[in-house]
């Protein structure tokens, strides 16, 4: 139940932060309402000037060893974070605080689970079994800055979600001299790739990060090749929903143009019914969603019990193609909502659900 509540809160927050501090009031209301419901229910180049061959070889070996050691613990070239803020990385990065589930997942996959000394509550809800037991957890929106400072981490990775209300909730941490590296919510697959590269550079895992990005790019191209082969007239229309409308909240939050979810749908040869919306994360009325008559409905809702049947039996939706043909599919909420390389898992889920025959050669086990 806790992970389901986390999933819906994260979905709301993703929609809110992607459009920045000026997000519409409906999105903010949805976040606050969801958080309330959740409460109720329970991040020199070395050279040698030696003139002798022996000294040159020795220095070259030393340089190689130092480079290898440095790649394990730190990076020297990063001067700004992903938000453009100037940062100074410590010489060695050993202890890390991650305040975003997407970053936490990347760090774990870089082999740094044991280096994470604290995280946000959502990270622990999703990945607690892979982290050190009983590590401190902080609220993403109102973190205990004094305790974070006291932990003395080498780097703190933060997210744009924490600044969605227009306040720098890590101001005191920055002023303490700690290295705070902010990573805004990614809007594209390229953004996600750049985030992974940035994190790898910060923690001395550039080679490993590059390998993750290369694998991600390879998978995207494999899917894109199939997507390009689908004739325009055979492309299915798709409604993606973050969570299912209800009597209490009849609004459908979906992914519009300028989002990596819309990008993924286009790559696999599908048509997003919300692609023409001006907002990145538009709020659709049920009437508008029904009128779009999607061929397929994809839901990231991990909260509504028996969500597929709930959608298939919603009053007023019986004439929607996706409902008539039982083309309603549930995606992994963590995979689709957390902007890291595992969005490829969600992309494969999308592709094999929408076009099972065309993507039958693509295995989810081969995903990033």
Segments predicted by a language model, with ranges:
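A short, structured surface patch at a secondary-structure boundary
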Residues: 95-151, 155-162, 270-273, 301
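Short secondary-structure boundary segments
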Residues: 160-161, 242, 277, 300-304, ...
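Bacterial Sec-exported substrate-binding components of ABC uptake systems
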Residues: 3-10, 20-104, 206-240, 293, ...
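Extracytoplasmic/secreted envelope proteins and their assembly/folding machinery
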Residues: 90-93, 100-107, 113, 145, ...
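Structured C-terminal subdomain patch of bacterial secreted/periplasmic proteins
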Residues: 191-201, 210, 214, 221, ...
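Extracytoplasmic ligand-binding site segments that recognize negatively charged/polar headgroups
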Residues: 164-168, 184-198, 231-260, 305
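Short helix-initiation/N-cap motifs at beta->coil->alpha
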Residues: 81-84, 135-146, 277-286
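Alpha-helical, coiled-coil/dimerization segments enriched in small aliphatic residues
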Residues: 121-125, 251-281
């Amino acid at each position: 139940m806790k992970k389901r509540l986390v999933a819906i809160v994260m979905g709301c927050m993703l929609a809110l932060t992607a459009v920045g501090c000026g997000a519409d009031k409906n999105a903010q209301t949805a976040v606050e309402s969801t958080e309330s419901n959740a409460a109720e229910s329970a991040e020199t180049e070395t050279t040698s000037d030696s003139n002798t061959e022996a000294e040159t070889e020795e220095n070259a070996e030393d340089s190689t060893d130092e480079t290898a050691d440095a790649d394990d613990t730190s990076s020297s070239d990063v001067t700004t974070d992903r938000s453009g803020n100037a940062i100074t990385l410590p010489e060695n990065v050993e202890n890390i605080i991650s305040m975003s589930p997407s970053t936490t997942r990347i760090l774990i996959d870089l082999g740094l689970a044991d280096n994470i000394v604290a995280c946000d509550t959502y990270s622990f809800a999703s990945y607690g079994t892979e982290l050190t037991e009983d590590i401190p957890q902080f609220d993403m929106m109102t973190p205990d800055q004094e305790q974070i400072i006291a932990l003395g981490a080498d780097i703190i990775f933060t997210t744009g979600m924490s600044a969605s209300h227009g306040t720098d909730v890590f101001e005191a941490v920055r002023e303490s001299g700690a290295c705070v590296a902010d990573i805004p919510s990614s809007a594209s697959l390229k953004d996600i790739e750049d985030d992974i590269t940035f994190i790898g550079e910060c923690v001395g895992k550039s080679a490993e990060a590059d390998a993750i990005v290369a694998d991600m790019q390879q998978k995207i191209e494999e899917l894109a090749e199939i997507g390009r082969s689908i004739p325009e007239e055979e492309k299915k229309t798709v409604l993606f929903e973050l969570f299912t409308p209800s009597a209490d909240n009849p609004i459908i939050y979906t992914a519009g143009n300028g989002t990596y979810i819309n990008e993924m749908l286009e790559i696999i040869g599908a048509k997003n019914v919300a692609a023409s919306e001006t907002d990145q994360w538009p709020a659709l009325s049920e009437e508008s969603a029904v009128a779009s008559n999607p061929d397929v409905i994809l839901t990231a809702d991990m909260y509504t019990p028996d969500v597929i049947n709930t959608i298939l039996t919603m009053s007023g939706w019986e004439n929607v193609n996706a409902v008539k043909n039982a083309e309603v599919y549930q995606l992994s909420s963590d995979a689709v909502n957390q902007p890291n390389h595992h969005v490829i898992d969600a992309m494969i889920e999308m592709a094999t659900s929408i076009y099972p025959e065309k993507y039958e050669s693509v295995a989810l086990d081969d995903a990033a």
